């Protein structure tokens, strides 16, 4: 991968304040580059970035961006592509009076099915219990957060055997929907 090729990248608003570097848990995920006009900016090393989002929160200049496929999503809906959505329970909690309207708009736009990720959490819980019981696996790391898994994979590989071999609730839900619905 390399510069600006991952999920997170730097845009032209960077003023090299280094706040992104100071909050990043992965020292090798950011580096300074000299641009053709003589100015500098901090780039994201796509292979090292774990996409945790800390730099987004720290940057007051909105110099960090991410690959956004929202436009493609709506284009696909217009073309009639059958799309199902998995919605995090936090969405309903954050928008308790509006979430039904938002989901209704998406359904009217052509979304085939809308499912709560809590459904995937039930599958994940079953898979954890099943794995622990069948393999007598104690002291494992059960982590549905991709940023933590990416961090372990890239920076502490000796912990890989401790990661529970179970997908996140989102992935379990998506796999079930794709296979059975």
Where are these regions (language model features)?
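Alpha-helix N-cap/helix-initiation motif
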Residues: 13, 48, 162-166
